[in-house]
Amino acid sequence: MKKFLGLLIKKIYKGLMILVYRPKVVGRENMPKDTAAIVCPNHVHALDSTLIISMNKRHIKTLAKEELFRNKFFKFLADLYGIYPVKANNKSMESIKVSLKILKNNELLMIFPEGTRNGMAKGIKPKNGAVLIAATAGKPIIPIGIQGSFKPFTKVIVN
């Protein structure tokens, strides 16, 4: 029952994303169809991760700061979408181990190199975790650029 409910919620959510943000996906052919890779988008809005996950045919797992999991609704969605909690400013091996396990299982992993929304616009240099994990796992990095305001009924481009 939970699996059915999860699929139903994902379908409804994807429909809402298409209706409200009219995403245009460019370069979908660059996404690996059956091998592991790290997907690295810029981070412009709180809905970035779910937009990318919803618009991709293959499931993408991601990491999020553990404070977000205090919100019961977010935790529910995180369980549906395969979002794992990590300590945001902790240099522990926990997030690296989780990431390597995801890649070892031949799955896609999404990491936001900025570490925060609009990080580069704020002058924050991208973090090197994605490169470290890619080099350790021997997996490619797929860059993704998100353009748009995420204002309702405006187009968002995922490139």
Name each model-derived stretch.
Residues 1-9:
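Helix-enriched interaction subdomains in cytosolic or periplasmic regions
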Residues 11-35:
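A short, well-structured juxtamembrane/interface segment
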Residues 12-13, 80-86, 113-117:
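Short, basic, glycine/proline-bearing loop/turn elements
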Residues 18, 31-90, 98, 151-152:
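Catalytic core of membrane glycerolipid acyltransferases/transacylases, capturing the structured
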Residues 36-38, 106-112, 142:
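Residue-level preference for the first positions of well-ordered beta-strands
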Residues 89-92, 123:
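A conditional alpha-helix N-cap/helix-loop micro-motif detector
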Residues 101-130:
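Catalytic-site beta-strand/loop segments enriched in glycine and acidic/polar residues
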Residues 122-159:
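A cross-family acyltransferase "interaction/gating" segment
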